Amino acid sequence: MGFHSKNNSEYNGDFIILSSIYYWMILLYCIKFFLSKYLIYCMSLTYIDLFSGAGGFSLGFDRAGFHQLLSVEIEPHYCDTYRANFPDHQVLQQDLTTLSDDNLLRHINHRKVDVVIGGPPCQGFSMAGKIGRTFADDPRNHLFKEFVRVVKLTQPKFFVMENVARLFTHNSGKTRAEITEQFERLGYKVKCKVLNAADFGVPQLRSRIVFIGRKDGGEITFPEPSHTEYNTVGDAIGHFPKLNAGENSLILNHEAMNHSTQMLEKMSFVKNGGDRNDIPESLRPISGDVRKYIRYHSDKPSVCVTGDMRKVFHYEQNRALTVRELAALQSFPDDFVFLGKKIAQQQQVGNAVPPLLAQAIAEAVLKMNTNE
């Protein structure tokens, strides 16, 4: 009984056939993969993020399915953080006032912009209306006018502008009306509302005014609260390893700052959720910001996170919160990295739009666009 064995040419022929099959299978998979990515790219609503900071607003819009075209931020450390977390985004480290119309359009390849988002710093609240000039005329509010300029240039379907809640009532509501009028002159229907981030899952009582403009004149709707029971400080940061003042950890940005012996002694008297009144009168600070020398309450949302939380202590550990913990109170994910010196990192966190709030706003914009 004989055995038939294949010669080399037959083996080579089989190998070539199999290789060809695998080649076409891989090629078809790659075509399908990149085609799906391209379709998502083409169908996604696009946005520009002005005064983007560390990227809280961008993160929320990305999660809702938007496609970023450009972000503009002047501060170097903010840009470093943004680039580290959004490697596929285009971010310009530049003063928006020096970015010409032509260069802005060139950076986005003259693509259609669907949404312009941002929170322009407005410093002229205290004086506008009191010395005979309007909010828009106050030179300290020139960045607001830059936001208006970009909206006028790109003519997006929508714009979303976020700012501090006191703008709603400033100058008996005249400032709010003036801002609205600036955009109405460009043909936008505009509404504004004060939103509390805690209503959307952020473990923090943080109220912000949000202006939404719509180019087609359709109905403007704001996101409906998703949380009647608020997430708490304990919910947000209870899983992080305990640290003493000055200690570090292997977790990203989870490094405790040093405190003076006097500060640690004073704060040792303050109970969970307590304030300076818990400190013995002989040690108690006589004056100063009432928002300092307090402890977070483990079973309540956080007080509003700012760029300096060094005298607001952990509910059970005798130290201020780490950047990682503060970021969690702003609803940033645990893998979101913050770069720069610690105080710069804290400022990045405190000045950010909470991603969960941003996502809720983005989803409201998507819904309006779908129902146009």
UniProtKB/Swiss-Prot annotation:
Record carries keyword Nucleus: no
Pfam family, one: DNA_methylase
Gene Ontology biological process terms from the UniProt entry: DNA restriction-modification system; methylation; negative regulation of gene expression via chromosomal CpG island methylation
Gene3D superfamilies the UniProt entry points to: DNA Methylase, subunit A, domain 2 (3.90.120.10), Vaccinia Virus protein VP39 (3.40.50.150)
Ranges in coiled-coil conformation: none
Annotated catalytic residues: 122
Reaction it catalyzes: a 2'-deoxycytidine in DNA + S-adenosyl-L-methionine = a 5-methyl-2'-deoxycytidine in DNA + S-adenosyl-L-homocysteine + H(+)
Broad class of enzyme this protein falls into: transferase
Signal sequence, renumbered to the chain: none
SUPFAM superfamilies: S-adenosyl-L-methionine-dependent methyltransferases (SSF53335)
Domain SAM-dependent MTase C5-type: 45-372
GO molecular-function term, one example from the UniProt record: DNA (cytosine-5-)-methyltransferase activity
E.C. no: 2.1.1.37
InterPro entries on file: C5-Methyltransferase, C5_DNA_meth_AS, C5_MeTfrase, C5_meth_CS, SAM-dependent_MTases_sf
CDD domains: Cyt_C5_DNA_methylase
Entry keyword set: DNA-binding, Methyltransferase, Restriction system, S-adenosyl-L-methionine, Transferase
Something else known: Both this methylase and M2.HphI protect DNA from cleavage by HphI.
NCBIfam families from the UniProt entry: dcm (TIGR00675)
Similarity comment: Belongs to the class I-like SAM-binding methyltransferase superfamily. C5-methyltransferase family.
Known role: A methylase that recognizes the double-stranded sequence 5'-GGTGA-3' and protects the DNA from cleavage by the HphI endonuclease.
Protein name in the entry: Type II methyltransferase M1.HphI
Organism, as annotated: Haemophilus parahaemolyticus
Lineage: Bacteria, Pseudomonadati, Pseudomonadota, Gammaproteobacteria, Pasteurellales
Gene that this polypeptide is encoded by: hphIAM
